[in-house]
Amino acid sequence: MDRHKTLAIAESCTGGLLTHRLTNISGSSQFLEAAVVAYSNKAKQKLLNIPSRILRQHGAVSKHTAAAMAQSIREIHKTDFGIGITGIAGPTGATKTKPVGLVYIALSVPAKSEARLRRGSPKAARRWRPAETLCLQCRFKGTRTHIKRQASTQALRLLKKCLSY
């Protein structure tokens, strides 16, 4: 990751696996600012300020919740990027509309116009900036462990793809 970019992560169904994989990289403290495992709805509200309205209307496993997690963790820690992951790793917890393996991965990134403005000002780089949020809906198969691994891998791919632009 570009040494001038920072990242904060909000995980739910992956239980910290994405953070674990990133912290296995020597020098990850240069870009990883913070990580939170907000497994319950109460934790999502308390640690990430996710509005109860989003959780009531869309549920903990939704693109809306994943996006709110990514945006919130980014805003709270004033980082360049924020990742939010929520889903159903199984084997229990599924419904007809939300099966085991359904995972939402959101990436909150600096808005393009803001990114250009920040380049010349180190002070501006540490302020909160407006963002765009990308969200993937994924359907993974396998055991709980496999689903968590696939979700963390997909989050890394999404971040890498975003950084390559």
Outline where the language-model segments fall.
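Short Gly/Ser/Thr- and charged-rich N-terminal loops/segments
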Residues: 113-127, 131
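Short alpha-helical segments enriched in small residues
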Residues: 1-113, 130-165
